[in-house]
Regions:
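Glycine-rich NAD(P)-binding loop of Rossmann-like domains
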Residues: 1-13
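Rossmann-like adenosine-cofactor binding region
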Residues: 32-135, 151
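C-terminal helix-to-coil terminal segments
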Residues: 78, 126-186
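Residues at the starts of beta-strands that form the adenosine-phosphate
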Residues: 23-24
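Aromatic pocket-lining residues of Rossmann-like dinucleotide-binding sites
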Residues: 18
Length: 186
């Protein structure tokens, strides 16, 4: 079971790929109505703790806010089941390509060391650049990239298209889909 924290465009794309591989997908996003997830066959949880209790794989797709700082901590990692719906041991896995600081790196390292967490993949760190002496970097079940997860030709092409579409929308008198202060403009 894959749990997605945040269920915007990127998370919805991840959900489609996971479903194509036969994964059961769950999500938590306090800002989206349940109908958004239901429409694409994803189970939306109203409580983030329930997501951790249900899923062995967590992928982060939310912004860093006061509420999401260290959202993934020792307490929540310990809630993860480590077994799939067929009661087969598959371990617990976390991926964060969203924002540094959402994962409590010390808690994640302790969970890796204890075996509660099977693998951790980070493209973002709480403090960047990450300290080269960090014990996290030496752990055999840690996979990291230096905040370059979106540095692909395809991703940069998509960003260019998104910007062009937003500019065109505004020039035609509309409000761009990516506007973060929509309320202030109305």
């Amino acid at each position: 079971r894959l749990g997605l924290i945040g269920f915007g465009r990127i998370a919805q794309g991840v959900a489609k790929v996971a479903q194509a591989f036969g994964m059961e997908v769950h999500s938590y996003d306090p800002y989206l109505p349940l109908s958004v997830a239901k429409k694409v066959g994803v189970t939306m949880h109203k409580n983030v703790d329930n997501l951790f209790k249900t899923c062995t794989h967590i992928s982060v797709h939310c912004n860093l806010t006061d509420e999401t700082h260290h959202l993934i901590n020792q307490k929540r990692i310990s809630m993860m089941p480590g077994v799939d719906p067929f009661n087969l041991k598959c371990g617990n896995h976390i991926v964060n390509c969203a924002r540094g600081g959402i994962v409590d790196e010390d808690a994640a390292l302790a969970a890796l060391n204890s075996g509660q967490l099977t693998s951790l993949a980070l493209d973002v760190f709480e403090h960047e650049p990450v300290d080269p002496a960090s014990p996290l970097l030496e752990h055999m079940n840690f996979h990291g990239t230096p905040h370059i997860g979106a540095a692909t030709i395809e991703a940069q092409h998509r960003v260019g298209l998104d910007i062009a579409e937003a500019v065109l929308t505004v020039l035609q008198g509309g409000i761009a889909d990516t506007t973060v202060n929509r309320d202030a403009l109305s």
